[in-house]
Amino acid sequence: MNWQDECYLLSKRKFRENANIINVFTNNYGKMSGIVYGGNSRKIRNYLQISNKIIVEYIAKNENKIGYFKTELVDPNAPRYFNDKKRTAALLSMTSLLNSLLPEAQPYKEIYLSLRILINNLTLSNWAYLYLFWELDLIKKLGFDQNLNQFFNNSTENNGVVKAEVDNIKYKIPNFLIKNKVPEQHSDEDLKSGFIFTRT
């Protein structure tokens, strides 16, 4: 089975002396694993960084055994934010979530598109809000919809929180998540409540 596709690097681990086993999220094939021979060489190591966009050519002689990748850099997302701890943390969080939650070899084109849009939007000032929306959308697309619409009412302001109970657990849900709209006034406290909600 041979194919070529664009993808984002989700994880990598050393394999033998000069190779890596990597997990990638591809546009057409979903999450895939493969060996990159020479992955620890200076040339390949420099761009084989988590969240970087690459093109992979997958070659497998036997469907029952892991194949190997030939790789080529497309967009160096990781080094772009080396000096920005928060955006770097966001990139690592995105890739870690996808690596943990996505099943192997099942295409999720909508999730792939949403990831590409989010990474492109990390340059915006409201990127943290967009990240939270992305997390909720990811959960929904994987079949775990929180159905926040049940807490919506016309008097709900963009700022502040709603105290609610979901699955017998009490939460403080930021109103901007319920309305699915970036608030005009950015609030660190609301963002904190949002991250607490999506991680519990």
Question: Which sequence ranges carry the predicted segments?
Answer:
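Non-catalytic alpha-helical scaffolds and adjoining flexible linkers that form interface surfaces
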Residues: M1-N20, F25-T200
